[in-house]
Amino acid sequence: MTDDLNGSARDCVSKPMNAGEVHLSINAGVASVVFDRPLSRNAMTWLMYEQLGSICRRLRVDHSVRVVIFQGAGGEAFVAGTDIEQFKAFNSGDDGVAYERTIDQGIGLIESLPMPTLAVISGWTIGGGLAIATACDFRIATPASRFGVPIARTLGNCLSMSNLARLSAAFGVQRVKRMLMLAELLGADEALACGYLQQVCEPAELNGAAATLCGRLALLAPVTQQVTKEALQRLLMRGLPDAEDLISQCYGSSDFHEGVDAFVAKRSPVWTGR
């Protein structure tokens, strides 16, 4: 029997047009979380981030759930970042600090779920979408999937320290430099080779592979899984230096506002270094 919990997620905030939704359903101990905004490659709106947080808080206390799957709707993207239109309202570096702090809290809710988590990826996994996937314990993807944070080409913003720590642990520092400083996108083969992906399989086999991995995880000791997750998270996040001054500098720059304006206008940005 499937428990469809979409209504509770929708009710947490009012829904503007094309704001997208995050759906939750639970079947036989497996929770499925779906990012549903396929016409925009599942780019996250503020509403979707709020719904995701509400869902994670609900799952955290649901002891019937053994595994959580995160997946994008439509087959073209997992999540293609945060909807850039929303950044037009940013006026200062403080807005960027508040945004990164909020995103960190949301990603932390995924990371701190007590049960194993799996990102099932088909297509673009960019920016905030890469952060969501990286917060999961395991990831499987299709061969055409792409991974990156091309903000040096698009927005001219930066990442939080905790987001950088997660990406560096998952990919290695040099690959993170390629993604951030060269705006490169990594393919599925490279993501598999460096250990970021558990498996690469054809689109028709993706859901079956996810079900198989969920079955393996559900048979194993949940306390061991939970304690291991928490211990690794403590190791990763211990003693991270503060970087809010860097975030404020970046989001408060003229280049950031130029990046947003250029993206919305569908033109190439003109960077000035200011």
Model-derived features: where do they sit?
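Conserved CoA-thioester-binding segment of acyl-CoA-metabolizing enzymes
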Residues: 2-71, 108
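Glycine- (often His-adjacent) and acidic-residue-rich active-site loop
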Residues: 64, 72-109, 155, 239
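Glycine-rich beta-to-alpha transition loops that act as phosphate-gripper elements at the mouths
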Residues: 120-126, 180-183
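Well-ordered beta-strand positions
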Residues: 138, 178, 182-184, 190, ...
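C-terminal long alpha-helix characteristic of the crotonase
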Residues: 140-145, 197-242, 271-274
